[in-house]
Amino acid sequence: MAMQREAGVQDFVLLDQVSMEKFMDNLRKRFQNGSIYTYIGEVCVSMNPYRQMNIYGPETIRKYKGRELFENAPHLFAIADSAYRVLKQRQQDTCILISGESGAGKTEASKIIMKYIAAVTNAQGQNEIERVKNVLIQSNAILETFGNAKTNRNDNSSRFGKYMDIEFDYKADPVGGIITNYLLEKSRVVQQQPGERNFHSFYQLLRGANDNELRQYELQKETGKYHYLNQGSMDILTEKSDYKGTCNAFKTLGFSTDEVQTIWRTIAAVLHLGNVEFQTIEDELVISNKQHLKSTAKLLQVTETELSTALTKRVIAAGGNVMQKDHNATQAEYGKDALAKAIYDRLFTWIISRINRAILFRGSKTQARFNSVIGVLDIYGFEIFDSNSFEQFCINYCNEKLQQLFIELVLKQEQEEYQREGIEWTNIEYFNNKIICDLVEQPHKGIIAIMDEACLSVGKVTDDTLLGAMDKNLSKHPHYTSRQLKPTDKELKHREDFRITHYAGDVIYNINGFIEKNKDTLYQDFKRLLHNSKDANLSEMWPEGAQDIKKTTKRPLTAGTLFQRSMADLVVTLLKKEPFYVRCIKPNDLKSSTVFDEERVEHQVRYLGLLENLRVRRAGFVHRQRYDKFLLRYKMISQYTWPNFRAGSDRDGVRVLIEEKKFAQDVKYGHTKIFIRSPRTLFALEHQRNEMIPHIVTLLQKRVRGWIVRRNFKKMKAAITIVRAYKAYKLRSYVQELANRLRKAKQMRDYGKSIQWPQPPLAGRKVEAKLHRMFDFWRANMILHKYPRSEWPQLRLQIIAATALAGRRPYWGQARRWVGDYLANSQENSGYEAYNGSIKNIRNHPADGETFQQVLFSSFVKKFNHFNKQANRAFIVSDSTIHKLDGIKNKFKDMKRTIKIRELTSISVSPGRDQLIVFHSSKNKDLVFSLESEYTPLKEDRIGEVVGIVCKKYHDLTGTELRVNVTTNISCRLDGKARIITVEAASNVEVPNFRPKEGNIIFEVPAAYCV
């Protein structure tokens, strides 16, 4: 440890007794002495000092650079340096996880870590690396402006989650990075709790911009004039200087003037939008204060009429039809607030993507694979407000996941590894919060799944309904309760509140708004409006607005599900890296630099699991490594193991090395790994290794470098010359041989299709593919030029049908003209008018939501069903489905029997002249048809036409080929039951018909029909 005098112990591991009383006593002494950092091994416990500390200057940075944790007093710089050294020495990705509740100092901790990394890198002073460092530092100012806000507990609270990967090259200099954001609390844009403020950006614009800028945005300095700002606190912080800092950060990150203008115009537009008011006059909804509407439209660069229409009306598209519905005042207010929240959320996401473009590694993908990263996680802390809503629910779930990760990595895995390796160990009990994570995220049973089910339900579903569903499904969960489940609990409001017992304590959530916030609905009208903005940057934020107005949009994933998935992805990312922990603690709720609230601090120590962490650390080991890797890294420091140890196993070699260096008292030998207890031992090993490496490298360079370079150069030069000449020769030979073979292709009947192409050389594989395409294009033109272009669609279908049937059915209508929609023809169908009406009705009111544009084929049929009955029906093939219709007597009524073409598994037909066809469905409900005309059997074969059309559409929809069976014994499934259809010739039959026989089906046809 450093020799300076400090209160208490610098590492909790050194406490003479492990108890909550001793832990708290040490924490209190250090806080009152101004020592805000204390270790638990390699975990840093950070107390928010609520004052400026003079411990972050250049001199302090130099003091911690390249030093081990135990060499200096505890500091965030030491944690940052440890993470950086692991990356530099082992090329191992690392991450620094900063956790703690809101106001505990997480954001400041992340900035201090970033400052240190920027200070200790780029020793050679390269301009590009210096630019990247500045961009990484300055990005924080922008993110705080647009993502942070004043809450009752924290003047600069992050209202979004941030994870930054800083990318380092092989010299361990920063070359780029990428920021991922999580769940911006956008509801704060339109409403704040008493004493809290909106995002800093609004106040910076009003109080920091000059008069000319405010006139340009048609704004006034008084925040009280704006509805979205006057609901909460109007305290003045440091907005004027912060505004200048934000604008300077924009310049540093390379934002153009146009982009910065878009950002501030959008912020101003949200303020004006909040002041738009609605009034109902003679049953008509109107906007009463047109000036704010006009200002909003101007700033968003849309027309006033378009904005007014989007706010007061809604376009509804269904079945290709478009209609407009008027809003009432309540709906208009909801739409306005939803628009304001969405605008700010999209702007924030766009700003982060723009920052990422500035800091993203500019090297090639090949280079990027070899880079290492340090991840810094600064995410919202655990929150308990007077009124806790959907946002607090998501934030606290996020903290549960991070706590679970900490438990998994620090407590659970470490103890399990000791037991697995045979290290003597006394198991330490701890609370595993997996049960709380499951309460939220468990599929089908968790709160998010219950919310999603409620959001997807048909009809009006209220928050009260959702709470009832949660009570029903979670009534027996030990960490969930509500007033309905606990009628005597007066703390909970009836039909409004529910309580979750989190690892950090009980939180009462108000259910009101959960459904709306989870759905996160925004009318398509607003997306179209902003996509059509003349501001190109704003338009870029709304790509969905380009969608056709008639197109019905799919229901997007809910906010809860998206957040759950993002948390799962974050955990996967963190598990790939070696973690370092900073556990932030809030000393009091008064933001005082002197008050140490015992109860408040002890509560945080308990739920963060710091005492359990201490017990594991005291009994555990600072480092462990597989024997083979340990020996590979340190073998050069011992004469007995360098250059290779041949006197036994890797374990024996490690033991020899450790005993020679006199570290045997500080290590334990597991089954597959060595465990080192003290960081001093690891430091000594690293120090000796670092002293040896220059000598080894110099020796190797002296002996080998010159020989390798000369040999490789000669080999490479010779190889390139030979390969280049050989490739050119083989390619010329191939092209000449091909030209000779294809010389008479134009005079051949098949235009050279039967000509065998020569085998291309390896260097000519790509050329061969291009030559094949050129030849196929030429040959197709030679074949098709004698046919009118109007016949090409039928010709294409006939080719598809011929390919599918593969010569297995001699008669398939190849010699006639194919019409397709026969029932729409008056010569084929006396009831064609009724048929056309039925098709129109089906198109406008699809039974299963599957719409279609056109009918590709239609015919009268005789169908056979699972009741062993045949009946006269009709069917159509559309561009997506196969529909069964009633017969002409019932005016072709839709029988609600549909097979989606993409759900077909195959088609079966017979080889004869009969018109039998079976459509096999993946749902085991096949369709069995015999094609007919209205009054008599068909005089022409139409099976080939049906096969060609269905096979083409199936390929269009799925990208794969549909199997076609040609046989007289067809297996099918009618309503799930397996049946066999046998085609039999019958001398006394004039018209084909079906009849049941012993559970199967006989299809009787005239003898002349059989092959």
From Swiss-Prot:
TH1 domain segment(s): 806-1007
Stretches assigned to the IQ domain: 694-714, 716-736
Annotated Gene Ontology cellular component terms: actin cytoskeleton; adherens junction; cell cortex; cytoplasm; microvillus; myosin complex; plasma membrane
GO molecular function: actin filament binding; ATP binding; calmodulin binding; microfilament motor activity; phosphatidylinositol-4,5-bisphosphate binding
Membrane topology: Peripheral membrane protein
Main location: cytoplasm
Places the protein is found: Cytoplasm; Cytoplasm, Cell cortex; Cytoplasm, Cytoskeleton; Cell membrane
Boundaries of every Myosin motor domain copy: 7-690
Lineage top rank: taxon: Eukaryota
Segments of this protein annotated with the region Actin-binding: 567-589
Presence of keyword Repeat: yes
UniProt xrefs under SMART domains: IQ (SM00015), MYSc (SM00242)
A biological process from GO: actin filament-based movement
Tissues where this protein is expressed: In the embryo, expressed in gastric caeca, midgut cells of the proventriculus, and in the mid and hindgut. In the larval gut brush border, expression is in the terminal web domain. In the adult gut brush border, expression remains in the web domain and has also moved into the microvilli. Also expressed at low levels in follicle cells during oogenesis.
Binding positions for ATP per the UniProt entry: 100-107
Disruption phenotype: Viable and fertile. Mutant embryos and adults display normal foregut left-right asymmetry, but inverted left-right asymmetry of the midgut and hindgut. RNAi-mediated knockdown in the hindgut at 0 to 24 hours after pupation leads to inverted left-right asymmetry of the adult hindgut, but knockdown at later stages has little or no effect. Adults display inverted left-right asymmetry of the male genitalia.
Family, per entry: Belongs to the TRAFAC class myosin-kinesin ATPase superfamily. Myosin family.
Comment field (misc): Overexpression throughout the embryo reverses the normal left-right asymmetry of the embryonic gut, giving rise to a gut that is a mirror-image of the wild-type. Ectopic expression in the larval epidermis causes dextral twisting of the entire larval body. Ectopic expression in tracheal precursor cells causes dextral spiraling of tracheal branches, giving rise to a spiraling ribbon shape instead of the normal smooth tube.
Classification via PANTHER family: MYOSIN, UNCONVENTIONAL MYOSIN ID
Quaternary structure and interacting proteins, as annotated: Binds to F-actin. Interacts with arm. Interacts with shg. Interacts with ds (via intracellular region).
Domain comment as written in the entry: The myosin motor domain contains the derminants for dextral twisting.
UniProt protein name: Unconventional myosin ID
Lineage: Eukaryota, Metazoa, Ecdysozoa, Arthropoda, Hexapoda
